[in-house]
Amino acid sequence: MSAQESCLSLIKYFLFVFNLFFFVLGGLIFCFGTWILIDKTSFVSFVGLSFVPLQTWSKVLAVSGVLTMALALLGCVGALKELRCLLGLYFGMLLLLFATQITLGILISTQRVRLERRVQELVLRTIQSYRTNPDETAAEESWDYAQFQLRCCGWQSPRDWNKAQMLKANESEEPFVPCSCYNSTATNDSTVFDKLFFSQLSRLGPRAKLRQTADICALPAKAHIYREGCAQSLQKWLHNNIISIVGICLGVGLLELGFMTLSIFLCRNLDHVYDRLARYR
């Protein structure tokens, strides 16, 4: 066996093993997304999310898993069987994925101000129509969860919730905010979130009285709530994690470039046989 043949054989099995790993990973992602979609009780109780946005994300996971499996399968079969057509298709899909990521990165960088303004408009619109439109429930619950995770309230400040029609108080009452703004660390009491994500509520921390309606959990703005807006919290999160985000993006990009280089090198250096399927007929 010549040095070139040994190199091609090494590249072939290297591509096969790594794509087999990603095929298994895609299968796990697909199974995980399907499990979330099917399991409406125990998993939701564990995560603390309402089922509507969780169902949306589970579909995204399932589709991502299927696409990962399909791409990895092309790489596995194309490399192992030395099929130029599959290797070429594998290279083309990786190139399309890489170009899409580069395009998105450029658009986000150049249109950052416009994107921030658009996100602000969407958030403020969601706040203003909070619990008034059943079709927007998923977006509202997702924003509730964002406030809970980022430990913030409103976009610029909790005063943004004064525009919410369903939370507007009478002139004699103080303003209300959703329970997702509740700062449980101030009282070491997190049971308010049982009302936010589920229909039952056992108790709430001191000084925080609930305004209970059909499916709204709200508490006075003077209670123990987060005082920082989510715009500031999001900027802090991005600043603290920018190195990790850039590192992950660079790692994924380099991995895709490596697979593209190996696949096109293997494809170009195979014997000039354009249809290896004939041997299996």
Swiss-Prot record:
It comes from the Eukaryota. It is a multi-pass membrane protein. It holds the Pfam family Tetraspanin. It is found in: Cell membrane. Glycans are attached at N170, N183, N188. Disruption phenotype: Cd37-deficient mice develop normally, with unaltered numbers of lymphoid and myeloid cells in lymphoid organs. However, Cd37-deficiency predisposes mice to develop spontaneous development of aggressive B-cell lymphoma. Cd37-deleted B-cells are substantially impaired in their capacity to roll on integrin ITGA4 ligands compared to wild-type B-cells. Migration, adhesion and cell spreading is impaired in cd37-deleted dendritic cells leading to a failure to induce antigen-specific IFN-gamma-secreting T-cells. GO terms for cellular component: immunological synapse. The chain crosses the membrane at residues 18-38, 60-74, 86-111, 242-266. Residues 1-17, 75-85, 267-281 are cytoplasmic. Interacts with SCIMP. Interacts with SOCS3. Interacts with DECTIN1/CLEC7A. This is Leukocyte antigen CD37. It comes from Mus musculus. The gene is Cd37.
